[in-house]
């Protein structure tokens, strides 16, 4: 078994002295003897174990050493860093908050929540929750605009502007960069990394916006509901891209999504909770067809990341953003098509 320190964690020795996690590379039994007379130490360590036919499994442990014990006491931690005991569910829920706060900071332009330190390694799984918020804000603005007598075209433009403001244009920028890359052939990665927008990228961005405006006008009174569904589906699509395809620019910071990912089913848990909430809120018979229209968004959610990934040979941070925007647009249209079939 190979034992190493976890990230930037340190080992607390006595009341004040700290031993760097780098020193833990020498093993879990030796570090106590290097404590220079301090008789107690507690810290976190990570063990990588190779099982038969199962590859390498990463586990976290909390170690406690004292001079009276021959070996450190190890308590296995869950993948989220909390002890695996009867309170695991509660600990798991509490450990989600820093990731959700990190997702809030990364995917929106809104300020950080007070009292929570964000964590960014696994923020992608909470993107659908952010989508629920953004889609809900857009739906509320649509309803307010209609209540004030604004025409549908004005409402459509307003809600798209709100979405761009809340996201900082992060995903639309990915659409344009990916459009340039897809048109550049073998130089696609260089074209996507270029901060200048080419003709293909500009056309791709306009296409996405026009598709959304057209779909919202076609949906009319059901536009607010489908706005929420599409915003959630759009942020599920990158999770599939992360799971299915390699990251093409590992040296770029966007690769941390894939580096820190867990099995796909675990990554989809927040999305499943959001989708279950949307279904539960629409179970009354008059809204059944709306639920079916919303669920149609699963089709572009499955297709868009696969099609883009096959064209590029993998994904980048830009193509993750493109997956969000194209999936949103096609989710709106697939919902409209389902409503037409049911009418």
Regions from the PLM with identified roles:
Residues 183:
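Structural signature of FAD isoalloxazine-binding scaffolds in flavoprotein oxidoreductases
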Residues 3-5, 9-11, 18, 23-26, ...:
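Alpha-helix boundary/capping motif
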């Amino acid at each position: 078994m190979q034992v190493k320190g976890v990230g930037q964690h340190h080992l607390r020795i006595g009341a004040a002295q700290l031993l760097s996690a780098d020193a833990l590379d020498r093993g879990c039994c030796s570090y106590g003897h290097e404590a220079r007379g301090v008789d107690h130490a507690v810290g976190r360590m990570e063990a990588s174990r190779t099982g038969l036919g199962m590859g390498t499994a990463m586990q976290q442990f909390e170690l406690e050493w004292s001079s009276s014990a021959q070996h450190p006491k190890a308590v296995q931690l869950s993948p989220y860093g909390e002890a695996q005991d009867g309170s695991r569910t509660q600990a798991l829920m509490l450990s989600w908050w820093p990731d959700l706060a990190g997702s809030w900071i990364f995917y929106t332009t809104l300020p950080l929540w007070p009292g929570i330190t964000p964590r960014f390694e696994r923020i992608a799984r909470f993107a659908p929750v952010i989508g629920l918020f953004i889609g809900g804000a857009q739906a509320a603005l649509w309803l307010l605009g209609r209540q004030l007598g604004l025409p549908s075209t004005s409402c459509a433009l307003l809600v798209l502007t709100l979405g761009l403001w809340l996201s900082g244009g992060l995903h639309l920028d990915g659409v344009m960069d990916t459009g340039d890359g897809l048109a550049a052939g073998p130089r696609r990665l260089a074209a996507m990394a270029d901060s200048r927008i080419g003709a293909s990228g500009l056309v791709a961005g306009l296409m996405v916006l026009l598709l959304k405006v057209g779909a919202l006008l076609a949906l009319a009174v059901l536009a607010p509901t489908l706005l929420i569904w599409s915003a959630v589906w759009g942020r599920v699509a990158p999770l599939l891209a992360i799971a299915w395809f390699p990251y093409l620019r590992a040296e770029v910071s966007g690769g941390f999504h894939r580096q820190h990912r867990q099995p796909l089913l675990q990554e989809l848990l927040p999305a499943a909770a959001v989708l279950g909430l949307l279904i539960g809120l629409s179970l009354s018979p008059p809204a059944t067809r709306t639920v079916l229209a919303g669920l149609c968004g699963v089709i572009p959610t499955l297709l868009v990341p696969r099609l883009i990934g096959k064209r590029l040979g993998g994904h980048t941070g830009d193509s993750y953003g493109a997956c969000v925007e194209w999936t949103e647009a096609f989710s709106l249209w697939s919902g409209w098509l389902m409503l037409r079939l049911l009418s």
